[in-house]
Regions:
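Transmembrane helix-bundle core of multi-pass membrane transporters
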Residues: 153-207
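Structural signature of hydrophobic alpha-helical transmembrane segments
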Residues: 57-70, 116-127, 198, 248-261, ...
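Membrane-interfacial amphipathic/re-entrant helices at transmembrane-helix boundaries
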Residues: 8-71
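Hydrophobic alpha-helical transmembrane segments
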Residues: 62-67, 120-125, 150-151, 194-199, ...
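Non-transmembrane accessory domains of multi-pass membrane transporters/channels
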Residues: 333-367
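Helix-loop-helix "hairpin" substructures at the membrane interface of multi-pass membrane proteins
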Residues: 190-261
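Long, low-complexity, charged/polar intrinsically disordered regions in eukaryotic proteins
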Residues: 307-338
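Short loop segments and helix-boundary regions at transmembrane helix junctions
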Residues: 78-92, 99-171, 270-284, 298-307
Length: 367
């Protein structure tokens, strides 16, 4: 047994421990980067104060993004297994015209155009319309999912860009800050936003847990689900509705451009660690929550960095580590397993060749 084989066998017995050690290593690395960027004693004190949630503003933003990460990772697993990773991108872009239309309607009615509940309602409506159109194109034409989602993505984002241009040119309208929904403005989250994210997290996680058996069947074998009488189309729409809810509440935190990364990266990273669905769900939620917590903490320390982008970069770092060291599909463990298999096959071929030679040249000895 080589030392590499021994390391892999040891790691397989301690999967959760190694995964937690990787998260701890990332936390230590980010803390070191933050301390290097803030060399003063006051800056170093801020590192611990922000990471441990002692500051009210940082606590609000960190908890909100962590909850959003947990929910995004959870529903992202079903998107990934359903082979609809592009759906999150299509949905996020489908919400863009709804924000502009809601602003125009509220302004024309004499209200405050930037009233957040109204903007999110408009985003939800157009997001649902986008989901329905994707499903309609898929079931009424010969186009596949990727083509349908690509059409909806381009059309709705183009419409949103045109409407936002009208909003910016509207006389007397205060449209400042509307571009924050594109890239996210997590620093502007208030307590009401935290309550909304908490409520959506509880609802989405509860629905996903209650329907996990049905979602699993639809994700892995839709044809079998239909043959058994399961309402596959209805379950599909419920799943997309949960994704829409997560996308809408995540607009202000990470923006419609980066929300797709928040949905897919944690699920993709978790896929490298396990073949079991319930473990994958737990890992994806943990990776999403850790990415939101670490990313928002680091963004609070380095004020020139946007929160949404930092969160996605942290998630990408965890993804790269998972791609290298993940026990189920990681590059290094898979290379070790392939090397062991080749050696085993080579030994078997060698022994068989020796036996055939002995049997041919010395049949009595071979017997």
């Amino acid at each position: 047994m080589t030392w590499r084989t021994g390391c892999v066998m040891w790691a397989h017995k301690r999967q959760k421990g190694i995964f937690l050690l990787l998260l701890l290593a990332i936390l230590t690395l980010l803390g070191g980067v933050a301390e290097a960027a803030l060399p003063t004693d006051e800056g170093k004190a801020d590192v611990w104060r922000i990471i441990t949630l002692q500051s009210y503003n940082s606590r609000l933003v960190t908890l909100s993004t962590a909850l959003l990460g947990v929910t995004s990772g959870l529903v992202g697993v079903f998107l990934l297994l359903r082979k609809r990773s592009l759906m999150g991108d299509a949905l996020s872009h489908a919400t863009y015209p709804g924000i502009g239309l809601a602003f125009l309607i509220m302004t024309c009615l004499g209200g405050e155009g930037k009233w957040l509940p109204g903007l999110l309602l408009g985003a939800s409506i157009t997001g649902v319309v986008g989901v329905i159109l994707v499903s309609a194109i898929r079931h009424t034409t010969l186009l596949k999912d990727d083509a349908a989602m690509g059409i909806i993505l381009g059309v709705f984002f183009g419409a949103g860009a045109a409407i936002m241009k009208m909003v910016s040119n509207l006389p007397g309208a205060d449209a400042a800050g509307m571009d924050g929904f594109v890239y996210g403005t997590a620093a502007s989250l208030i307590f009401g936003d935290f309550v909304l994210i908490l409520a959506v997290t509880a609802f989405v996680c509860g629905a996903a847990i209650l329907l996990i058996k049905e979602f699993t069947l639809v994700c892995f074998d839709e044809s079998f689900a239909i043959s058994q009488g399961w309402p596959a189309l209805r379950l599909d729409l419920i799943m997309l509705a949960l994704v829409t809810a997560v996308t809408v509440v995540g607009l202000q935190a990470v923006g419609l451009v980066l929300i797709i990364a928040f949905l897919i990266i944690p699920a993709a990273a978790a896929r490298f660690w396990t073949h079991k669905l319930h473990v994958m769900l737990w890992l994806a939620a943990s990776i999403g929550g850790a990415s939101g917590w670490l990313g928002s903490s680091l963004s609070s320390l380095l004020v020139d960095l946007p929160t949404g982008a930092v969160i996605v970069l942290v998630a990408a770092t965890i993804f790269m580590l998972s791609m290298l060291f993940g026990f189920a599909r990681g590059i290094l463990p898979r290379a070790v397993r392939q090397t062991r298999l080749r050696r085993k096959v080579g030994k078997q071929h060698l022994l068989r060749a020796i036996y055939e030679i002995l049997e041919r040249d010395q049949p009595d000895t071979a017997e």
